[in-house]
């Protein structure tokens, strides 16, 4: 019989082993059933007709950071992903609404049929959300690949832009005035990035998005493929929307965390992993996971330039609440509209210790408003806790 001492806190990432398996329970099932006990112990058990003790899995999860993230998200729906960009270690994975794995057998029928909360859905890996302005890292990368520089771009933001009878507004109709590329990114200017997107075109944006694993498989056991619909035939209004993270694009928080990990790790995405080590019943190490590179998503120079853009977001832009700390942060906020009334999910992606990145955080708060309102304070609590330890 399983006992989950943390109850709901790790419910999705650790998973369950009743009514099928999910999460780490599924990934580590064979390992937990396998025994590397000392051979004399196995002979003794065979003689006594007793079972050998299965191996123990040591996860990469950080219980303290998980608790901080879990409590910071509170009663709101959403997800938090925290990773170590240089290794691929998955340190935190929170998804809410959640469930108690200790009582999942008793509550199974209710949980399976609960379409309102979808508590069994791991929003961190399998949630599908419009990325909002976090997608501007993709648009920015495509611009750099096409132009070779961010210098020389100038735009006069008047609070809205209309092309082919389609109008896009900046958040709260803010008029940003004269901007270069860096200030447009820091201000999260929708008008400038809609203008940039139209200049790039659907085919170019699609190529760069797919380089960053949109419409592609991810190096995970369980995930939802992120979708990106632009192509060479896409109409201008859809390109405008897509370039600012709206349109038909859908992405998981984990996928945005992986893109951020690549930016923080000189362009290389390390293969994410949950199992740090396997030990036998005597505590001897059976297998230790060694970090391995999964794929280079961008050049070192491209990653460095995106990092500079994201640093400016914290220094003088929409994530300025994270500035002035004992450590540095680079990030991007997002407000992803999801209905006709203009309600939006609150996004943040970013990393700390900019010169030698140590921690990547991705946060989404459903119906949380702007990124700076809900997601940034959660990320701040996680960064603070990590750097205080």
Describe the residue ranges of each PLM region:
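Short hydrophobic alpha-helical segments used for membrane anchoring or interfacial signaling
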Residues: 80-85
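Short, intrinsically disordered, mixed-charge
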Residues: 33, 74, 311-315, 384, ...
């Amino acid at each position: 019989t399983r006992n989950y001492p943390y109850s709901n806190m790790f419910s999705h990432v650790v998973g369950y082993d009743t009514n099928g398996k999910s999460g780490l329970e599924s990934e580590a099932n064979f390992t937990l059933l396998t025994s590397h006990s000392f051979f004399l112990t196995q002979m003794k058990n065979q003689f006594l007709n007793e079972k050998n003790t299965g191996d123990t899995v040591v996860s990469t999860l950080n219980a303290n950071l998980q608790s901080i993230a879990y409590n910071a998200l509170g009663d709101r729906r959403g997800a938090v992903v925290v990773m170590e960009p240089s290794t691929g270690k998955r340190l935190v994975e929170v998804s809410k609404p959640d469930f108690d794995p200790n009582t999942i057998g008793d509550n199974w029928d209710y949980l399976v049929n609960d379409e309102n909360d979808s508590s069994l859905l791991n929003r961190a890996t399998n949630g599908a959300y419009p990325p909002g302005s976090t997608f501007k890292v993709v648009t920015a990368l495509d611009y750099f690949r096409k132009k070779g520089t961010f210098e020389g771009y100038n735009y006069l933001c008047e609070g809205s832009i209309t092309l082919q009878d389609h109008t896009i507004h900046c958040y709260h109709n803010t008029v940003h005035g004269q901007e270069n590329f860096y200030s447009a990114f820091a201000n999260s200017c929708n008008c400038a990035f809609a203008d940039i997107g139209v200049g790039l075109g659907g085919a170019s944006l699609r190529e760069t998005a797919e380089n960053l694993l949109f419409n592609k498989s991810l190096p995970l056991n369980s995930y939802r493929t992120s979708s990106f619909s632009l192509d060479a035939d896409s109409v201008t209004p859809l390109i405008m929307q897509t370039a600012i993270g709206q349109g038909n694009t859908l992405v998981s928080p984990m996928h945005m965390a992986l893109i951020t990990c690549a930016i923080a790790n000189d362009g290389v995405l390390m293969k994410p992993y949950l199992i740090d080590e396997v030990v036998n019943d005597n505590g001897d190490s059976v297998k230790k996971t060694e970090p391995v590179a999964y794929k280079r998503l961008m050049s070192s120079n491209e990653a460095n330039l995106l990092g500079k853009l994201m640093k400016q977001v914290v220094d003088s832009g929409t994530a300025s609440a994270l500035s002035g700390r004992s450590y540095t942060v680079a990030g991007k906020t997002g407000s992803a509209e999801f209905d006709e009334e203009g309600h939006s999910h609150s996004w943040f992606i970013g990393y700390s210790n900019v010169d030698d990145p140590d921690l990547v955080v991705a946060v989404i708060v459903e119906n949380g408003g702007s990124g700076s309102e809900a997601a940034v304070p959660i990320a701040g609590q996680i960064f603070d806790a990590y750097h205080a330890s």
